[in-house]
Swiss-Prot record:
Organism expressing this protein natively: Mus musculus (Mouse)
Name this protein carries in UniProt: Ribosome biogenesis protein BRX1 homolog
Record lineage: Eukaryota, Metazoa, Chordata, Craniata, Vertebrata
Subcellular localization(s) per the UniProt record: Nucleus, Nucleolus
Domain Brix stretches: 60-249
GO molecular function: rRNA binding
Family (UniProt): Belongs to the BRX1 family.
Length: 353
C-alpha cells in the first residue's frame, strides 16, 4: 500500500511520493511471474495425495486367513477379498490339529476384532467362518459357486483402497437371523472412514442378495457418467449352516433347516445314478426273457384282405434266340496266355539251376 502523509494544519491526506525503481528492481516481477508459472505446471502434473480432513475413529480390523489344504481357487478368493478390503490383515495358514478357539488368540495378537476364516475339508468342501472376536457371535457358512477376479475377467474396475457402498436385499429385514447377519456383514465389509490405507472415493458397491435360502455376493463398479453398474468380481454364494453365540463356538442361536451337507448331497447323487443303472439292467433282463419265449402265431384274418387290390398281370415275353454271352474284360486281362507260360517256365528253370 502507498504510504500517506498528513499535514498538521488542514488535516488533509496527501499521498507520499513513490521511490523510483532502479533497473535491477524492474526485472524482479517478471522473474517472479516465471517462477509462479513453473510452480503451477509442476502442480498440474503432480498426483495429489489422499485427502484426510477428519479423524480415523472406527478401528475395525479384519483378519483374513485359512486352514491348510485349500485349493488354488480358495487362495485366489482370499487374495481378492484382502485387496478389496484395505482394513484387513493376513496371517499364515492354520494347522488342522489346532482347535478353532485358538483363532481368538491370533486375533488378539494381530489387534483384530473381526475374523474371516476359510476352513477346507476333504480338499473339495470350503466353509467360511465370520466371527466377532473374542465375545461373539459367529456364523458358519458353506461357500459355493466361487468365481475369482482372474477367472471372470469382467470389464468393471475400481480404485484400489476405495470405500464401497453396501447394498442389501429387503429380505434381510424380514427375519431376525437375517437382520443379525446384515449387521455382521456391515461391520466386516464396510471400510472405515479416514482409514490410513483407504482412498476417499466411493466407486463400487457390494451387493448381498437372498435367493434360494442363500446369500449371493456380487461386486459392481459405479460409472460416473450415467450411474450404471458394471460387474467387477469376485462371485460366491454363502449357504448358512449355524449361528453361534460365542466366537467359533458356544450355544447355537440359529440352525438352518434347509441346509444339506455336501456329504449328503453326494450320497443322493450316487443313489440316483445307482437307481438309473438298476433300471437299465432290469430292462435288459426283461428283453432277454421276451426273446426266449415262444412266438405266438396268430391265425389268418380273412377280413385283412378286403381292401387289397390285386396287381395287373403283365404279359410274359418268351425269347426264342439264345442271348450272346457278355465279355468280361477283367477276366481276359487276368488270363495267362501261352507266351506267359513259357516265360514262367524259363524263369523257374533258371532259378532251379
Amino acid at each position: 500500500m502507498a504510504a500517506t502523509k498528513r499535514k498538521r494544519r488542514g488535516g488533509l491526506e496527501v499521498q507520499a511520493k513513490k521511490p523510483k525503481r532502479s533497473s535491477k528492481d524492474a526485472g524482479q516481477p517478471a522473474k517472479q511471474a516465471d517462477v509462479a508459472k513453473e510452480a503451477e505446471e509442476e502442480n498440474r502434473d503432480r498426483i495429489p495425495g489422499p485427502v484426510c480432513k477428519g479423524k480415523w475413529k472406527n478401528k475395525e480390523r479384519i483378519l483374513i486367513f485359512s486352514s491348510r489344504g485349500i485349493n488354488f481357487r480358495t487362495r485366489h478368493l482370499m487374495q481378492d477379498l484382502r485387496m478389496l478390503m484395505p482394513h484387513s490383515k493376513a496371517d499364515t495358514k492354520m494347522d488342522r490339529k489346532d482347535k478353532l478357539f485358538v483363532i481368538n488368540e491370533v486375533c488378539e495378537m494381530k489387534n483384530c476384532n473381526k475374523c474371516i476364516y476359510f476352513e477346507a475339508k476333504k480338499k473339495q468342501d470350503l466353509y467360511m467362518w465370520l466371527s466377532n472376536s473374542p465375545h461373539g457371535p459367529s456364523a458358519k457358512f458353506l461357500v459355493q459357486n466361487i468365481h475369482t477376479l482372474a477367472e471372470l475377467k469382467m470389464t468393471g474396475n475400481c480404485l484400489k483402497g476405495s470405500r464401497p457402498l453396501l447394498s442389501f436385499d429387503p429380505a434381510f429385514d424380514d427375519l431376525p437371523h437375517y437382520a443379525l447377519l446384515k449387521e455382521f456383514l456391515i461391520q466386516i465389509f464396510s471400510t472405515p472412514r479416514y482409514h490410513p490405507k483407504s482412498q476417499p472415493f466411493v466407486d463400487h458397491v457390494f451387493t448381498f442378495t437372498i435367493l434360494d435360502n442363500r446369500i449371493w455376493f456380487r461386486n459392481f463398479q459405479i460409472i460416473e457418467e450415467d450411474a450404471a453398474l458394471v460387474e467387477i468380481g469376485p462371485r460366491f454364494v454363502l449357504n448358512l449352516i449355524k449361528i453361534f453365540q460365542g466366537s467359533f463356538g458356544g450355544p447355537t442361536l440359529y440352525e438352518n433347516p434347509h441346509y444339506q451337507s455336501p456329504n449328503m448331497h453326494r450320497r443322493v447323487i450316487r443313489s440316483i445314478t445307482a437307481a438309473k443303472y438298476r433300471e437299465r439292467q432290469q430292462v435288459k433282463d426283461v428283453q432277454k426273457l421276451r426273446k426266449k419265449e415262444p412266438k405266438t402265431i396268430l391265425p389268418h384274418d380273412p377280413t385283412a384282405d378286403v381292401f387289397v387290390i390285386p396287381a395287373e398281370e403283365k404279359p410274359v415275353e418268351i425269347q426264342w434266340v439264345k442271348p450272346e454271352p457278355k465279355v468280361d474284360l477283367k477276366a481276359r486281362k487276368r488270363r495267362i496266355y501261352k507266351r506267359h507260360r513259357k516265360l514262367q517256365q524259363k524263369m523257374s528253370r533258371g532259378s532251379a539251376k
